[in-house]
Amino acid sequence: MNLLIMGLPGAGKGTQAAKIVEEFGVAHISTGDMFRAAMANQTEMGRLAKSYIDKGELVPDEVTNGIVKERLAEDDIAEKGFLLDGYPRTIEQAHALDATLEELGLRLDGVINIKVDPSCLVERLSGRIINRKTGETFHKVFNPPVDYKEEDYYQREDDKPETVKRRLDVNMAQGEPILEHYRKLGLVTDIEGNQEITDVFADVEKALLELK
């Protein structure tokens, strides 16, 4: 089974990806892991990626696409199938993935889209606070400290609501064309992500069993 998982930051995509890998035994292919492995193994694309990263530059699409292609061509993929997590990030990368899969004789079986209302995600992502003395992390709503005094805690700049909202806006603008592309191919299953983790996975599992 060859899968793609999508969802906005904070939707619980990583948690569900780990559960899918555990339950269905597919290879988990996350962008960060792929880059690290390609650079550690000094593959052609890994060396190219490292040359950009060492200069503090963004890795161009053609290199990212090349690293994905290298990984998808490995033997375990044909045996186990895969779950792509964090790629494609743009519609251009989605088209490149289509071409790669066709070239390798693979096909995408389904796209799991974890849906959570953006306003809920702002609350989830902007609630993180850090104790000034201990460095411990808490959440204003989901994991509040026992003796909360506002002056004892601070919030990182990228956890502030306006920053979180901007990040979500960027992700939505990039993600919608990708979802639309796969919807036209009849591959997308939307999963309600604003429920308990176990309930989310029950819905994911049901959808995947129907694909098998």
UniProtKB/Swiss-Prot annotation:
HAMAP family: Adenylate_kinase_Adk (MF_00235). This is Adenylate kinase. It is found in: Cytoplasm. It is an enzyme of class 2 (transferase). Keywords: ATP-binding, Cytoplasm, Kinase, Nucleotide biosynthesis, Nucleotide-binding, Transferase. PANTHER family: NUCLEOTIDE KINASE. It holds the Pfam family ADK. Consists of three domains, a large central CORE domain and two small peripheral domains, NMPbind and LID, which undergo movements during catalysis. The LID domain closes over the site of phosphoryl transfer upon ATP binding. Assembling and dissambling the active center during each catalytic cycle provides an effective means to prevent ATP hydrolysis. It catalyses: AMP + ATP = 2 ADP. Catalyzes the reversible transfer of the terminal phosphate group between ATP and AMP. Plays an important role in cellular energy homeostasis and in adenine nucleotide metabolism. Its EC number is 2.7.4.3. GO terms for molecular function: adenylate kinase activity; ATP binding. Its main location: cytoplasm. It comes from Streptococcus pyogenes serotype M3 (strain ATCC BAA-595 / MGAS315). One of its GO terms (biological process) is AMP salvage. The keyword Oxidoreductase does not apply. ATP binds at residues 10-15, 128, 137-138, 195. InterPro entries: Adenyl_kin_sub, Adenylat/UMP-CMP_kin, Adenylat_kinase_CS, P-loop_NTPase. Monomer. Pathway: Purine metabolism; AMP biosynthesis via salvage pathway; AMP from ADP: step 1/1. Belongs to the adenylate kinase family.
